Amino acid sequence: MAPPVSERGLKSVVWRKIKTAVFDDCRKEGEWKIMLLDEFTTKLLSSCCKMTDLLEEGITVIENIYKNREPVRQMKALYFISPTPKSVDCFLRDFGSKSEKKYKAAYIYFTDFCPDSLFNKIKASCSKSIRRCKEINISFIPQESQVYTLDVPDAFYYCYSPDPSNASRKEVVMEAMAEQIVTVCATLDENPGVRYKSKPLDNASKLAQLVEKKLEDYYKIDEKGLIKGKTQSQLLIIDRGFDPVSTVLHELTFQAMAYDLLPIENDTYKYKTDGKEKEAVLEEDDDLWVRVRHRHIAVVLEEIPKLMKEISSTKKATEGKTSLSALTQLMKKMPHFRKQISKQVVHLNLAEDCMNKFKLNIEKLCKTEQDLALGTDAEGQRVKDSMLVLLPVLLNKNHDNCDKIRAVLLYIFGINGTTEENLDRLIHNVKIEDDSDMIRNWSHLGVPIVPPSQQAKPLRKDRSAEETFQLSRWTPFIKDIMEDAIDNRLDSKEWPYCSRCPAVWNGSGAVSARQKPRTNYLELDRKNGSRLIIFVIGGITYSEMRCAYEVSQAHKSCEVIIGSTHILTPRKLLDDIKMLNKSKDKVSFKDE
């Protein structure tokens, strides 16, 4: 069984750092505090701890800093906020004057670097009310044990919009992302060798150089400007256009399939059981979810009933095939197994909902998609005419426009670009003129849609000998990159270093003689070896997240941690792609 989340990965590292840097720093025996959070820190804390954890740290009430609140002048307040004008202004309103201040005193902890302008504003207004004011350098969300995001989905538009009027805003976004990435490295106690994918765009190069400079600044240890030596780790920075296929392909592993086909919002799955509407959060506290989320849907549909039969056969409570109704009856008969069984009911519902969508109109699509993506069929024979493979999908009235667009994109990606005439014909015949920018705008990510000349496709690792399901033959490109990085096979021209002193990377876990041994809480979470940290500009897919776990499992000497601006799903990505050539005032942003 998977270990509980408290023993696993990035989430526990982040929680322990917050515990040490914030709660231990302002702890006073027997004293309770009110905690104020903004939108970002609410997500951050929710990702790595529970309310019971906060109660243990002396937090009695949690409030939204943006909302009007009643004063509680006999209590001290702990502000855990982002160093933004909005959050700082909300803090200042709480301590506007001595007669109007809401709390007895304030402890302020910023997620990362607070600009001098904001710091001086605080200092000038209410310094006498402040007991602490610190920066703790955690400006990312630990989504999973090996996955992080910066929670900046709007960065996609600014990084890939062709509108020159967005250039200055793009620079601000890149600077902010670099600051956030440095906090990921700092939290992991890593000073990695920084590399980037040199093509097709220069975003990765620019961001990598910013990150390297900020790492140098962060790890300066004295006035002589000495830098902490590079640790046995690498940070790879990549533009989203490096693998367009994995973003639109229908995936049949459980987590990726569920988030693609079902309306799951904020990791919350809604379902019906026993005639009642219910909700379940898909999170790593659920050991069964951790166990099955990366498995193929066919395996999941076999495994969950098998687990149920183990329980039922032990108690001789049910006989025959395990169904949802049988599970409901079993919970009534054995209330002490209720929690265990209810999780299995959730995941069986989830799997069955996925399969219902799959059988309705996705099953036939998947074979076409795999053939187009790989250029070979299930028998390994080369596809001679991709258009003949695509046509049945375009003519099928049961497929909605989004699925047809995904298929057209896979056709174009598979042949590495088409002609303007052919693209116009496809758009007209499928009647997707209103959504044609979902196809054309991929060029802004450096993906060849209508290239001026035929380009060679990047070589892929031969995985023909690997055992796969026929409808799941595609392997995300990121897996090749992870494996090559660990085995020291990344081409230095294609993957330049921008570090002055790159780590010697051999994946063996060997540590340089210059590197001082460290004994701290991070060692509990770190494998006896190296770390590979990946950052993708513009979103990662659930299938790419899965690869981090698979490669870590296969290469015991290296832990792979993957992150991005945000996590994407195919439909949301296509909506974002469509908006790239729109002016900023026509685009809806997260904070507006």
UniProtKB/Swiss-Prot annotation:
Give positions of region: Mediates interaction with DOC2B: 1-255
User: Any stretches that span the bilayer, and where are they?
Assistant: none
UniProt keyword annotations, A-Z: Cell membrane, Cytoplasm, Membrane, Phosphoprotein, Protein transport, Transport
Tissue distribution of the protein = Ubiquitously expressed in all tissues tested.
* UniProt modification remark: Phosphorylated by PKC in platelets in response to thrombin stimulation; phosphorylation inhibits binding to STX4.
Q: Does the keyword Membrane apply?
A: yes
Where is this protein found? Cytoplasm, Cytosol; Cell membrane
Q: Answer whether the UniProt record assigns the keyword Cytoplasm to this protein.
A: yes
Q: What is one GO cellular-component annotation here?
A: platelet alpha granule
Q: Which domain of life is it from?
A: Eukaryota
Describe the task this protein carries out. Together with STX4 and VAMP2, may play a role in insulin-dependent movement of GLUT4 and in docking/fusion of intracellular GLUT4-containing vesicles with the cell surface in adipocytes.
Say which family it is in: Belongs to the STXBP/unc-18/SEC1 family.
Assembly and binders:
Interacts with STX4. Interacts with DOC2B; the interaction is direct, occurs at the cell membrane, excludes interaction with STX4 and regulates glucose-stimulated insulin secretion.
What is this protein called in UniProt? Syntaxin-binding protein 3
Task: Name its species.
Answer: Mus musculus
